């Protein structure tokens, strides 16, 4: 009995990743044993995701305002190289998806379109939505989780407080520290939350509905795996000139796993912030780059848009030449960066990409419906790739800047 309690104590105080793994196994086991019991624990997952989503907006706002207000003069934040990495990574993801889709063309079994959804009419509408999110009411931005608006107001307040008294700056620093402590507590509850999420997912879908889309999923997940395990490490190696895999694997393990099950980049912002702190990155940098990455670093979304659009074109017998495929890569990358400005995210940007090939809106919405069917896996993998890449690129840019400073 004493040995058993000792094992439980070790498990409770041990590795969070190990605890999450236990939660996943327990969730799958419960769903296999009893669907009804699994549905009863779904609220644990909802509570966990709800807590992360609730604290993320105020965390981003206070952390950004505090870090900018307390920033020392002549401090390098390395934001430009990080933004370049985000944009290049998203384009590389779209290009990889094009190549894989051409190597393994997929036919879709089109279903009825999704009711009550209205995709944007063009890239102009996506950009217009993003611009208006930028000047959203700050209280509304915090309430609705509009991270573009939160970032804008956080940066504005931080700049305004830059010349404030030291005591005012210290208040913001203390509040920021307090919220970070709350985030650490919520993250410790991840195994319980993921147990509920996994149990509910297996109980509700059983993954039988998505078995018919195995080839499409193989292309989607294959492209995401290539980006996560080959392209991203290659980009990181170019930046830091050393073996990138320890960093990449750690980010996939500590950020990607949580993001996979929460299926929310916003909910994973506190997890990424905590990981950046563990990696000893500059707070002035990651407090801005992580929420910005959750908004514009959308490699997974670019893959989803590209693969489903080319699958639709192949199903309809439309020949896609190399130039059009390259144009699709650009459109998918730009659209993906605006995915946070569209209700429904990457899936509702598919009609925009389909319009390149003259595919009607009715057919495009049927493709969106296919996306919703495979969404349990597609959305989870997409979020895991997007969110873990935020930390990978931030860490790579910070290390590259440190190496340059040492040499200089």
UniProtKB/Swiss-Prot annotation:
This is Serine/threonine transporter SstT. GO terms for cellular component: plasma membrane. GO terms for molecular function: neutral L-amino acid:sodium symporter activity. Involved in the import of serine and threonine into the cell, with the concomitant import of sodium (symport system). It catalyses: L-serine(in) + Na(+)(in) = L-serine(out) + Na(+)(out); L-threonine(in) + Na(+)(in) = L-threonine(out) + Na(+)(out). Its main location: membrane. It comes from Shewanella sp. (strain MR-7). It is found in: Cell inner membrane.
């Amino acid at each position: 009995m004493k040995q058993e309690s000792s094992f439980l104590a070790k498990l409770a105080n041990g590795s969070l990743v190990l605890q999450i793994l236990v939660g996943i196994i327990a969730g799958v086991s419960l769903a296999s044993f009893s669907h009804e019991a699994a549905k009863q624990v779904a609220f644990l997952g909802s509570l966990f995701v709800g807590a992360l989503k609730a604290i993320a907006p105020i965390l981003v706002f206070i952390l950004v305002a505090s870090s900018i207000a307390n920033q020392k003069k002549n401090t390098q934040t390395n934001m430009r190289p990080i933004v370049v990495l985000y944009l290049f990574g998203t384009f590389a993801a779209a290009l990889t998806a094009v190549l894989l889709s051409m190597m393994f063309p997929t036919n879709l079994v089109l279903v009825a379109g999704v009711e009550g959804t209205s995709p944007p009419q063009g890239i102009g509408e996506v950009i217009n939505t993003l611009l208006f999110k930028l000047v959203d009411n700050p209280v509304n931005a915090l309430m609705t989780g509009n991270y573009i608006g939160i970032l804008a107001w956080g940066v504005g307040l931080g700049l305004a407080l830059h010349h404030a008294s030291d005591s005012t700056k210290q208040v913001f620093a203390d509040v920021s520290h307090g919220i970070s402590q709350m985030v650490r507590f919520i993250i410790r509850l991840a195994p319980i939350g993921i147990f509920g999420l996994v149990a509910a997912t297996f109980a509700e879908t059983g993954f039988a509905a998505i078995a018919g889309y195995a080839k499409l999923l193989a292309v989607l997940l294959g492209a995401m795996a290539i980006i996560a395990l080959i392209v991203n490490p290659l980009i990181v190696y170019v930046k830091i000139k050393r073996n990138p895999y320890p960093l990449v694997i750690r980010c996939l393990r500590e950020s990607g796993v949580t993001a996979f099950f929460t299926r929310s980049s916003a909910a994973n912002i506190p997890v990424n912030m905590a990981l950046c702190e563990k990696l000893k990155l500059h707070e002035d940098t990651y407090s801005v780059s992580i929420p910005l990455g959750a908004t514009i670093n959308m490699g997974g979304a670019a893959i989803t848009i590209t693969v489903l659009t080319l699958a639709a074109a192949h199903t309809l017998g439309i020949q896609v030449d190399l130039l059009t495929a390259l144009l699709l890569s650009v459109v998918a990358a730009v659209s993906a960066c605006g995915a946070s400005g569209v209700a429904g995210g990457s899936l509702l940007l598919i009609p925009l990409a389909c319009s390149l090939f003259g595919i009607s809106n009715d057919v495009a919405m049927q493709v969106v419906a296919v996306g919703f069917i495979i969404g349990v896996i597609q959305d989870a993998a997409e979020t895991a790739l997007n969110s873990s890449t935020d930390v990978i690129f931030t860490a790579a840019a910070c290390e590259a800047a440190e190496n340059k400073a040492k040499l200089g």
